């Protein structure tokens, strides 16, 4: 069996097609929104379910100077031999727990987020053991109430970082924070956080900290809050063409295109009489004689059970709705009088060009956010990356 046959057979049941041309175009659009700030492409959680290495490479090709991850393991994978990430691209990680691989991260030339005294002590010890200084971004909690140093503890953290810097153990290259409500335009916490961030940055600089970058803007802030851009912006979900929230607007409003298209092949098509119960609990009963199609994807694949009897699916050009409960491996759609053959394509979501549902449609059906829809697509669904930089038929990239 050759490689093409293997890919074809692996994707017979379902596939998540990842349009790298669209991703590159999105990065360029976001850079245009970024007011001259550098762009960090956030590829945590396997690039929000899209495939971290392929998406990281595509983002860099489109001008991303930084890559961001949550865990150090994710960041180390980007520095592994064969990853294909240029050495001059900065890679930052920020979600640490005590005893983490600080030394490995320092030796891999990663940028390290530090938001508390315990973390500063561990990174300092690791730098001493590694025999080289760490690159550190001090994180301030400006109001999110999650990671980062509380304002009351900021002076102590800054003083300790300056002492370690004077000892040659680290370099404070960044000061940063994260916005709580940037996806709610006009929320009073936004200006309050920006004000506090400016104050905490100014204090650190008065103490002698000379950061290369200051950063607080996430995807919604990149799109709607130019005053938050500072030196570096962090683009996550918007890079994948998914709206941060309905209040922000549709991706197309900002020149963005959805990157992932999720499809499956109908596993079974059959006729049933009226009054026939469908799936667990018989929450759907056929209103009359009809045709049912079995879609071989379920909540084990990340299809949200909360979208039972609500999730939209395009089958042979017609929009259908999940009929009854979504099960672990499969769900059913009522096809009415249509009779597509087994193997016919069911499109769960895509950019919307062919009338198919979008990620936002599924988020609404499940009562959740687009972030969750794409990041939950499971490992049983192969990712097929198309329109890479060397593809002469890269229509999306040529349009940008």
Predicted segments, located by residue:
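Active-site anion/phosphate-binding pocket segments in diverse small-molecule metabolic enzymes
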Residues: 1-24, 28, 32, 74, ...
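Active-site-proximal beta-alpha core segment in soluble small-molecule metabolic enzymes
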Residues: 10, 14-17, 24, 37-215, ...
């Amino acid at each position: 069996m050759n490689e093409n046959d293997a890919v074809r057979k692996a994707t017979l049941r379902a596939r998540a097609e990842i349009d790298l041309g669209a991703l590159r175009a999105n990065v360029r659009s976001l850079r245009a929104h970024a007011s001259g700030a550098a762009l960090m492409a956030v590829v945590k959680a396997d690039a929000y379910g899209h495939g971290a290495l392929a998406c990281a490479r595509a983002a860099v090709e489109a001008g991303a100077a930084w890559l961001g991850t949550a865990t150090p393991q994710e960041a180390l994978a980007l520095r592994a031999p064969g990853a294909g990430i240029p050495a001059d691209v900065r890679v930052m990680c920020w979600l640490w727990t005590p005893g983490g691989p600080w030394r490995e991260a320092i030796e891999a030339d990663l940028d390290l987020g530090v938001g508390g005294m315990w973390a500063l002590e561990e990174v300092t010890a690791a730098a001493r053991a590694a025999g080289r200084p760490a690159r550190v971004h001090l994180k301030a909690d400006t109001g999110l109430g999650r990671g980062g140093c509380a304002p009351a503890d900021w002076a102590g953290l800054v003083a300790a970082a300056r002492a370690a810097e004077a000892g040659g153990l680290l370099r404070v290259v960044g000061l940063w924070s994260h916005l709580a409500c940037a996806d709610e335009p006009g929320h009073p916490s936004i200006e309050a956080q920006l004000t506090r961030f400016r104050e905490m940055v100014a204090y650190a600089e008065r103490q002698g900290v000379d950061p290369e970058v200051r950063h607080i803007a996430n995807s919604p802030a990149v799109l709607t809050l130019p005053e938050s851009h500072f030196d570096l912006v962090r683009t996550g979900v918007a890079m994948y063409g998914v709206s941060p929230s309905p209040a922000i607007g549709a991706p197309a409003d900002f020149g963005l295109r959805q990157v992932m298209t999720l499809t499956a092949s109908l596993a079974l098509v059959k006729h049933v009489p009226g009054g026939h119960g469908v799936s667990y609990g018989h929450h759907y009963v056929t209103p009359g004689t009809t045709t049912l199609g079995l879609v071989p994807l379920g909540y084990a694949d990340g299809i949200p059970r909360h979208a039972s009897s609500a999730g939209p699916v395009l089958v042979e050009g017609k929009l259908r709705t999940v009929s009854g409960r979504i099960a672990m491996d499969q769900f059913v759609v009522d096809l009415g009088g249509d009779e597509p053959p087994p193997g016919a394509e069911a499109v769960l979501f895509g950019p919307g060009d062919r009338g198919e549902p979008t990620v936002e449609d599924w988020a609404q059906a499940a009562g959740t956010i687009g972030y969750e829809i794409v990041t939950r697509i499971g490992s049983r669904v192969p990712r097929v990356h198309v329109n890479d930089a060397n593809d002469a038929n890269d229509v999306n990239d040529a349009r940008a």
